[in-house]
Curated annotation (Swiss-Prot):
Binding site for Mg(2+): 44
Known EC number: 3.6.1.66
InterPro entries: ITPase, ITPase-like_fam, RdgB/HAM1
Gene label: Itpa
Protein name stated in the entry: Inosine triphosphate pyrophosphatase
């Protein structure tokens, strides 16, 4: 499947300009396909993260009638059995980063993990959707740093004193869940030389 996509345009399903910018920055100029952002209204699927990613990708490929890349991000609180998980977008809209932190007020365990899944389809419904996952463990903390990128202010990756929002973008882009998932996508296309050395 990788060979059939080389040199082609892949629609990256997002309406978020910051997300597109981050993905392109992480993939770098050796990535053999051109990503073109397109906002597509997809149903809000429910289920486990992999199921949601596959369903979203299949529906996006059906609408685009060609190759698509869909990203799904989860923020999973261990004390809450993995919630909010794939529903983080809705929790964040209602609660803001402060509310996410307050959700864990009654729990000693503030550990969490950020999970990013990229789902890739050639656009051919007979071909399986491929999944590329990245996971970063961390803690949910009182929000700190810039407020321009989702829940970044309240997620502090393990081994760091800063939240994602406080980190320079270049540093975040070498440790984040999104970076780890995109690294696997790069490996699939055989273009990782040096990508993991940042």
């Amino acid at each position: 499947m990788a060979a059939s996509l080389v040199g082609k345009k892949i629609v990256f399903v997002t309406g978020n300009a910051k997300k597109l910018e981050e993905v392109i920055q992480i993939l770098g100029d050796k990535f053999p396909c051109t990503l073109v952002a397109q906002k597509i209204d997809l149903p809000e699927y429910q289920g486990e993260p992999d199921e949601i990613s596959i369903q979203k990708c299949q529906e996006a490929a059906r609408q685009v009638q060609g190759p698509v890349l869909v990203e799904d991000t989860c923020l999973c609180f261990n004390a809450l059995g993995g919630l909010p998980g794939p529903y983080i977008k809705w929790f964040l809209q209602k609660l803001k980063p402060e509310g996410l932190y307050q959700l864990l007020a009654g729990f000693e365990d503030k550990s969490a993990y950020a999970l990013c899944t990229f789902a890739l389809s050639t656009g051919d419904p007979s071909q399986p959707v491929l999944l590329f996952r990245g996971k970063t463990p961390g803690q949910i903390v009182m929000p700190r740093g810039s407020r321009d990128f989702g829940w970044d202010p309240c997620f502090q990756p393990d081994g760091y004193e800063q939240t994602y929002a406080e980190m320079p973008k270049a540093e975040k882009n070498t440790i984040s869940h999104r970076f780890r998932a995109l690294f696997k996508l790069q490996e699939y296309f055989g273009v990782t030389d040096g990508a993991g050395d940042h």
